[in-house]
């Protein structure tokens, strides 16, 4: 791995991965999803998620992104999935969360916001592989009523 270092003072100039945080928000057996109104993947469905900001925790970022993308408030239940994506220098972290209200709706970032029952999920219109995997894990865990944290590396082959 290449590092940029000053030859005179040996200071290392780090280029670090970006962290994406999000939430699988639940309300009465339904999952909150947003149709992206911005690129990349405009017009496809996702869980509320986005890049972490400075001076916030992972949980704060997931709650903020949920509000920014849906207009609704959430409360974190537990860390749920974490994906390392070294080929794009990102880490994606999703939490299970309770949706605290149904005051959701379109935002600048989302053209549509909707609660989906599991059998209503539009699998061919999911924006990102990490969102799809998180939803698949949720369905598996729901069937056995045991929700576990998963960490996975996704590498291009």
Question: What feature does the model see in each segment?
Answer:
Residues 26-68:
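Conserved Nudix-box catalytic region and its N-terminal flanking loop in Nudix hydrolases
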Residues 1-23:
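Acidic, metal-coordinating catalytic segment for phosphate/diphosphate chemistry
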Residues 3, 24, 33, 94-96, ...:
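Conserved hydrophobic/aromatic beta-strand scaffold that supports enzyme active sites
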């Amino acid at each position: 791995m290449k590092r940029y270092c000053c030859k005179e003072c040996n200071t290392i100039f780090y280029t670090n991965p970006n962290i994406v945080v999000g939430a699988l928000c639940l309300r009465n057996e339904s999952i909150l999803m947003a149709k992206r109104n911005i690129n990349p993947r405009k017009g496809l469905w996702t869980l509320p998620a986005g890049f972490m900001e400075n001076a916030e925790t992972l949980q704060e970022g997931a709650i903020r992104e949920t509000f920014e993308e849906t207009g609704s408030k959430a409360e974190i239940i537990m860390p749920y999935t974490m994906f390392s994506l070294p080929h794009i220098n990102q880490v994606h972290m999703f939490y299970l969360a309770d949706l605290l209200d149904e005051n959701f709706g379109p935002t600048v970032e989302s053209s549509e916001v909707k609660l989906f029952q599991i059998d209503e999920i539009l699998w061919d219109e999911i924006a990102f592989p990490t969102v799809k995997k998180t939803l698949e894990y949720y369905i598996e865990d729901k069937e056995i009523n045991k929700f576990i944290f998963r960490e996975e590396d996704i590498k291009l082959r």
